[in-house]
Amino acid sequence: TVKEMYRAPVHYDLIAHAVRRSRVPVLANGEISSVAKAQWVLETTGAHGVMMGRHAIRNPWLFRQWREHQAGQSVFQPTLGDVRQYLDDLWQTLLDPVKPEKHQLGYLKKFLNFVGQSVDPDGGFLKQMRHSREPDELWRVADTWLVEAGRAALPYPAEPYPGIIARPSREA
């Protein structure tokens, strides 16, 4: 991972090799983006469990969905309206009266880079969000993409859209 500068695809074959060779439980890690992906990784590698990381920023319901899947229950399907509420909750969590609002907005955008991977397939939300300079401007962007024109009822995809990059510095 380090030698590949964290940009190479996950080597699930090597995880499977470690599972076969190890006498202790092995957990799989790497791009566990959805319940379906977690299940696929478990089946493919034979790992004893999976670690879910940054994709839980994009989809904070991921752990709930995994528990529901494991229990054989119907899996919660968040909507774009749920995502809009999540953004409000994030903002409230990050608010700090001591820090300048501009810095707080920048910190929120770090999270939104991940959330935005599943908002629209063309990356329009991410582009507009990244260019917003004031909280009110950001909330207008969020409302446009997540709530207006009936979008609040649309399902929030389980997987990021292909080619939509969370980290602008990694865009080709």
Spans of features found by a protein language model:
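Short, small-residue-enriched loops and turns at beta-alpha junctions
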Residues: 2-8
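Alpha/beta catalytic cores of nucleotide-metabolism and tRNA/nucleoside-modifying enzymes
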Residues: 6, 13-28, 32-172
